[in-house]
Amino acid sequence: MPYPRKRFGQHWLKDPAVHEAIVRAAQLPPPQRDPAWVLEIGPGTGQLTQRLLAQGVHVVAVEIDRDLCRLLQKRFADQPRFHLVEGDFLRLPLPPQPRLLVANIPYNLTGPILEKVLGSPAQPVRQFERIVLMVQKELAERLQAGPGSKAYGALSVRVRYLAECELICRVPPSAFRPPPQVESAVVRLTPRPAPTPARDPRWFSQLVCQGFSARRKQLVNALGGLVDRQTVAAALAQLRLSPTARAEELDLPDWLALSDLLLEQTPRMAAVSGEGKPR
């Protein structure tokens, strides 16, 4: 078995119990005449791939490591439901067939990969029914966090706009070879088929990111770069939110309502808004 390469952020998941938990979390349909298609990002040596194929599905595996591609081609040479794509997932178009996605991904690429498979509030990706990812534990906490939590931030709100997130299991460093320096977790994202839309998703995104950019400040001050204090204060009062509210105290419906109300009152600002980045 090849040794994991640091430049690709590789850590082989060696715990079979975690492999099985990932397969169960994907909720694969039973074998049928027209098998389901699963996208696997970074199959590595094919341990998870083998378990997926055993469920009777097609697996489209995207692998950037040329040596691993040769290993995978040899390992699954007699498996007609295995489809290998060599290349950088972030530079390739999404293969059209898969409606399910599983991945044990490099943690430094989690943000860009999430954006590619979920999209953004302004441009949601509607391809996948379920997405099961191995991520750093701290990120899993951010994805799951709700109002009032220290982990709750712009990413929490933006992902919640697009999908429901569930924690499947925590994974210790000892489950990998070599062990990473952080704890991990498996999460399942279920994209919303029709998210409750903000009237202007770009404005919504920018407002959320601006609010959390100064999370210790009250919103009347934190949103000052976009909207004047008096307008924010009036909107909070109209929505029956505390005049001293901070970004971390608002849940998704609150942010949607505030975004739409401020859009009515500051149309010129919204018209020139660009989509913010998660923090």
Curated annotation (Swiss-Prot):
The protein's name: Ribosomal RNA small subunit methyltransferase A
EC number: 2.1.1.182
Record organism: Synechococcus sp. (strain JA-3-3Ab) (Cyanobacteria bacterium Yellowstone A-Prime)
Main location: cytoplasm
GO MF term set: 16S rRNA (adenine(1518)-N(6)/adenine(1519)-N(6))-dimethyltransferase activity; RNA binding
Annotated PANTHER family: DIMETHYLADENOSINE TRANSFERASE (PTHR11727), DIMETHYLADENOSINE TRANSFERASE-RELATED (PTHR11727:SF7)
Enzyme class: transferase
Function as written in the Swiss-Prot or TrEMBL entry: Specifically dimethylates two adjacent adenosines (A1518 and A1519) in the loop of a conserved hairpin near the 3'-end of 16S rRNA in the 30S particle. May play a critical role in biogenesis of 30S subunits.
Lineage start: Bacteria, Bacillati, Cyanobacteriota, Cyanophyceae, Synechococcales
A cellular-component GO term for this protein: cytosol
Record field: catalytic activity: adenosine(1518)/adenosine(1519) in 16S rRNA + 4 S-adenosyl-L-methionine = N(6)-dimethyladenosine(1518)/N(6)-dimethyladenosine(1519) in 16S rRNA + 4 S-adenosyl-L-homocysteine + 4 H(+)
Compartment list: Cytoplasm
Residues bound to S-adenosyl-L-methionine: H11, L13, G42, E63, D88, N104
The keyword RNA-binding is assigned to this record: yes
NCBIfam families the record matches: ksgA
InterPro entries to which the protein is assigned, alphabetical: KsgA/Erm, rRNA_Ade_diMease-like_C, rRNA_Ade_Mease_Trfase_CS, rRNA_Ade_methylase_Trfase_N, rRNA_adenine_dimethylase, SAM-dependent_MTases_sf
Family: Belongs to the class I-like SAM-binding methyltransferase superfamily. rRNA adenine N(6)-methyltransferase family. RsmA subfamily.
Annotated keywords: Cytoplasm, Methyltransferase, RNA-binding, rRNA processing, S-adenosyl-L-methionine, Transferase
